[in-house]
């Protein structure tokens, strides 16, 4: 991370496994490139809401507990009206929110998509990291942030469905999703899915 200022970056997927690292968060938030923010970086933002202003147009991928801390609402409040709350938060902060769940909500405050692809096998630690990596790779290919978030959620979910069909939701791991994304993309591009 010492060289962040010295390199041209297309995108950064950030926050997974960084722990409590305020200096690194602020350094990454200043880098001029597309960003997807997840996990520990979302927890940092929940305690440092002024830093949201540095992330205009970025993608945030909270699960309901992370989003409750970020939005200052209880998980129950979030789950009772997730679409409207995610839309308002995205609009107020000029961000793309991917509220992860069985049906993920992807919104920029103006447009909202509900992603129903996926399976219960994704409810494991590390699956969100895979999603962030997929979205980050799409951002690096210059796909606009909202479209990258929508496509990334679909690709991750569809890949998980395919992996679960070949093994089971009980035995699948996030690495199985990550290593199968290429086959899913190939099938999508050939209109087989």
Task: List each model region and its residues.
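Short, small-residue alpha-helix embedded
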Residues: 68-69, 124-155
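Short, well-structured alpha-helical segments that form the helix of a local strand-helix-strand
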Residues: 82-91, 145-158, 174-182
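Gly/Ser/Thr-rich beta-alpha loop segments that engage phosphate groups in nucleotides
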Residues: 17-21, 103, 120, 127-131, ...
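Glycine-rich phosphate/dinucleotide-binding loop and adjoining beta-alpha-beta core of small-molecule
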Residues: 1-117, 186-190
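Alpha-helical transmembrane segments in multi-pass membrane proteins
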Residues: 11, 15-17, 124, 132, ...
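Charged C-terminal helix
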Residues: 160-193
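Short beta-alpha connecting loops at secondary-structure transitions
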Residues: 71, 116-122, 132, 162-169
